[in-house]
Amino acid sequence: GELDDDDDMEDDDGFVEEDEKENCHRELARPAATAYVSAPVVVAKGPKPQGPFQVNSTKVNPDTVGAQKRRFLCYNTLGSVVATEDTNSGLKNVEMSFHDTSKGGRMPTITDDVGYELGVCGEKGVLLAAKSQIFFKPYESWTKDSEWTLEMSEDERPTTIACGDDFVAVATSQNFLRVFTSYGAQKEVLNFEGPIVSLAASNDALAVCYREHFSECKLKFKVLDVEKRVEKYAGNIPLSSLNSDEDDNS
């Protein structure tokens, strides 16, 4: 309702009384605090973009009992690659074994001096990667002379790897896709429009999953024929939308 007495109205017009002008001349040049109100800034919070990951790998089980920590670097239809660490001595090893024991069963243990974070077993051998190093160990000749190691620059590290029949592929933090022969010769260096998320390989085919742009969550894929050096398929990866109710209850 209306006020009957103007004297009851609080003086909030932004001006200084006449008898205060001399002492408060600076206040006159400044509007009242309530003269302008900034609109709240609303920042839309979207989903976090998918980072790189290695297919068929696991993390160390935090509930591991005993002195040895184990994690699968790879578990596929061919076999498994397991990284182990003795918590007492700090000794690290990598073990590879076939599901079909007629192919050789368990391979000799690989001493891990660099801390391998990625691993995959292919038709010709085992590919391991850590920091700025990749290491390939073939099955046919499980000797030191048959293996090879490649050192990349310190600012480029492997993020996901794959093994085909006669090639190995390494995606790196510099957004490069490097393809090598099983003997260690580099065949291709490709660059994608967005970060590579994961790789998978079979026979001569290499599947690449990547983000459309660096800040985007949209995922795309390409399937490359490494032997013929052609792109066989390409498209978008369908993803379900986030469910806010499930997110709130999680």
Identify the function of each model-found stretch.
Residues N93-T111, Q133-S153, Q174-L190, E216-N243:
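Surface-exposed loop/turn elements that mediate protein-protein interactions on large endomembrane-trafficking
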Residues R71-G90, E117-K131, T159-A162, D166-A171, ...:
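Short beta-strand elements that form the blades of beta-propeller/WD-repeat-like
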Residues P108-G119, E151-A162, V189-N203, V208-C209, ...:
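Canonical WD40 repeat/beta-propeller blade segments in eukaryotic WD-repeat proteins
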Residues V55, L78-A83, D165-V168, T172, ...:
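A broad "ordered helical/assembly scaffold" signature
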Residues E2-E140:
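Acidic and/or Ser/Thr-rich intrinsically disordered tails and linkers
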